């Protein structure tokens, strides 16, 4: 009986403590947990390599190159073919040989949404006001049986991210994504773990993602190496010459 009372009091105290916290305080604690703003801002480029394991047991090699302020290029290599998706700061483009498309092509508004999130170099919580994002603290939740602090992040384009923070480390352990596309909602879940410091900044080395409520469709990316301030060239992200004329007639992707 006494043990149960102690546990109950502890839970109540924890609940009262976290209720007093604000979204701003949790964002600040998350940034500090990652290494602090100074160390985060000292990184200007990233080169990540890893392996992606999907349903059916297939394994692909993946890379992600990114540069400030909003350039990203991602590759997916399997069975001698390499797919590419990139954002040059204005337009998203891709090469998808797996579907028989060996030539570069522009990405549509719906397809480019995830790439735009990846292009946000520091993520949506850093300088969120300047980016036009809003953050709300929604209180406690449970992730795989463990307590978590839930933040709602509404992006400038209207999409919503729910971040679940570990109450001890304040690092993200889960992210739920809601994309609003032509009157419908597309939902995905991303689980983050195996954090390691690189140049003083914490990065997740295990990333499992897939459609919400479909765990069997999840894919797991295991990061093998992260190089910070890698010598990347802007030309790696630029729209191929064959697409530039068509892109000039399209609205800037950031405006969607």
Enumerate the language-model features and the residues they cover.
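Gly/Pro-enriched, hydrophobic low-complexity segments
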Residues: 81, 144-239
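Short amphipathic beta-strand/extended segments with alternating polar/hydrophobic composition
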Residues: 61-65, 85-89, 103-111, 165, ...
